[in-house]
Amino acid sequence: MRKFSVLMITALLLSGCSTGEQPPIAAPGVIPSCDQIDISKETSEVLKMSCLDGSSEINYHSIKGPIIINVWASWCTGCKEEMPYFVDLYANPIFKSGEIKLLGIDVDEKNADSGPNFIKSNGMSWPHLEDTDSRSKLVFGPGVPVTYFLDKSGEVIHKHIGAYRSKSQLYEAVEKYFEVKL
């Protein structure tokens, strides 16, 4: 974890500034673009993943916060159970304004269409990356779901292993770790 923090700090020191402009939210049934995710301009190629809309690649270590990163898979029972809570959370004005961002990472799919179909059928209108070769396990570990909260400096301020069991549990974590009122 210390090595991860050092990498994140290094990436942030090398980062540029965001314009603060937010692209429009994707319509239901559309795979959203990853353009709204703030990233550093210079970073190593340690963990590069493709955006599920096919528009770009993003190196995980270049992602800036504040952001919630939810690692999921379409076949995962816990992921299916908690996804409505994330859909509801993303509708909150704090996320719509870009004050806090949400990023999904789809892992361990057997079929290339599974992740995009899951996103569309569940109304997941935030950006998603796909890990097609399981390299994300080096950072996030082997199990799903797992959710990370990163602060403005890119530091992990909270890690939740397993599914959120209620909307209130997820909301309470967001309010506590990002010091916001939803």
State what each model feature region is.
Residues V46-I67:
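A short beta-strand-turn-helix
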Residues M1-S50, E172, L182:
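N-terminal targeting signals for export/organelle localization
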Residues K80-N122, T132-L138:
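Structural microenvironment flanking redox-active thiols in thiol-disulfide oxidoreductases
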